[in-house]
Amino acid sequence: MNDAELREAIVSAAYLEGDFLLRSGKRSRYYLDKFRFETRPDLLAALGERIAAAVREHEPEAVRLAAPVLGAVPLAAAASLAGGLPFVIVRDEAKGYGTANRLEGVNVEGELVCLVEDIVTSGGALMDSISAVREAGLVVRSAVCVIDREEGGADALARHAVRLRPLFRAGDLLQGEKTPAKPHG
């Protein structure tokens, strides 16, 4: 599947119109439902290959991927299979049972990891994961996402010394049809 076919398949599978409240608290007239492209084996495999290639190109020294729960986990698994890098899962919070870790999977202090994310809007979810990864002693300086909604997330991450590498930008993905999210309230 080439880039144009992948772009078309993502839009066809995931683009919804209506009135949606985003995680950032903003409202939007369109929504890109990540689960509609992450649960399709053909799209997940293609995205895993693209993410693995982006990591090799933009963070070649990374020894591990890191994926925030829930949406980024299938993407990191697909990229891990495609590129051979292991990954850790970043929980929203440590659980009070089992290992009680916020990061699940094997990791070694000082390792360089690359974050994987599905869709970035304001960057808030990724900034929380960056904090967790850094608190665990890992180094993070880049993130690869499937879609950047172009609503300030890349700038927010840059303020935390993390470069965002999107596979697609909303404006390109939707060919100029992007409707900016509006503040909630």
Tell me what each language-model feature is.
Residues M1-H58:
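Active-site-facing substrate-recognition patch
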